[in-house]
From Swiss-Prot:
Keywords attached to this entry: Acetylation, Chromosome, DNA-binding, Isopeptide bond, Nucleosome core, Nucleus, Ubl conjugation
Official protein name in the record: Histone H2B.4
Cellular component GO terms, alphabetical: nucleosome; nucleus
Organism listed in the record: Chlamydomonas reinhardtii
Family: Belongs to the histone H2B family.
Gene Ontology terms, MF aspect: DNA binding; protein heterodimerization activity; structural constituent of chromatin
Localisation: Nucleus; Chromosome
N6-acetyllysine PTM sites in chain numbering: K41, K42
Chain residue ranges for the region called Disordered: 1-60
Record-linked PROSITE patterns: HISTONE_H2B
Biased composition (Basic and acidic residues): 1-10, 20-54
Length: 153
């Protein structure tokens, strides 16, 4: 509808004086630019904007934590025991730290071997290097079991 408004003043101004044209044209052009920009902005924002806003909100609100998994393991090991929010936060930080150490070590191993891909073998070696003694053996055992379960079914 905006182009119709622009067309009418242009045809009415054709018979008008030159000063009236000079005043009306900038107003008509500004109105036309606004009219053209506004629908395109709305059209662009509605389909993409909603998706982008949701994605941004999800990214902001979805902070990845291990709290749920820590709680599940706690209930498997000690069903009648609870955990405070401060202790849960400490456990979450601990897991993030260990994950970062293992990932860094696996990345280094991958670079040493001049291979672009970090495989389960690099992860296993990194776990052996990062974790001490018996803990490393149990972690490797559980990791191997998890990979076997994942690949088989």
């Amino acid at each position: 509808m905006a182009p119709k408004k622009d067309e009418k003043p242009a045809t009415a101004e054709a018979g008008a004086e030159a000063p009236a044209k000079a005043e009306a044209k900038p107003k008509a052009e500004k109105a036309a630019k606004k009219a053209k920009k506004e629908p395109s902005k709305k059209a662009a924002k509605e389909p993409k904007g909603d998706g982008e806003k949701k994605d941004k909100k999800k990214k902001k609100s979805a902070v990845e934590t291990y709290k749920l998994y820590i709680y599940k393991v706690l209930k498997q090991v000690h069903p009648d025991t609870g955990i405070s929010s401060k202790a849960m936060s400490i456990m979450n930080s601990f897991i993030n730290d260990i994950f970062e150490k293992v990932a860094t070590e696996a990345s280094k191993l991958s670079r040493y071997n001049k291979k672009p891909t970090v495989t389960s073998r690099e992860i296993q070696t990194a776990v052996r290097l990062v974790l001490p003694g018996e803990l490393a053996k149990h972690a490797v055992s559980e990791g191997t079991k998890a990979v076997t379960k994942f690949t088989s079914g």
